[in-house]
């Protein structure tokens, strides 16, 4: 049975949906992300062949099926296959504490769950400082899960 079918079966057995925008990381076992990439690579190769692209002789297209599989799993849809980052709150009580509003600018590359095409944008996250703050990088890392 293929890795994707095993994961789908686990999701179905647990009564969980697996729509394009859903995070399914709790149902992926160690090593299965790489197995999904290996499973997808020849399928992406078939898509390229269907588009009449010479993936054997065109040096730019040689190995592109594998690169596409890696890009979808590890980058464009990373929020689907990776758990949400753990955010630790730190005391904001030192002499150099933050006061007022902090603004985090984050460039975002994701995927439209309807057209499955790349979406790029910029998010500005405003944080009102209080007694505790989470690390600023966690706000950016959390964006891939939205």
Protein language model regions, located:
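Active-site loop/lid in soluble adenylation, ligation, and acyl-transfer enzymes
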Residues: 2-122
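Histidine/lysine/aspartate-rich catalytic loop segments that bind and position anionic ligands
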Residues: 125-142
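Conserved small/polar residues in nucleotide/adenosyl-binding loops
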Residues: 144-146
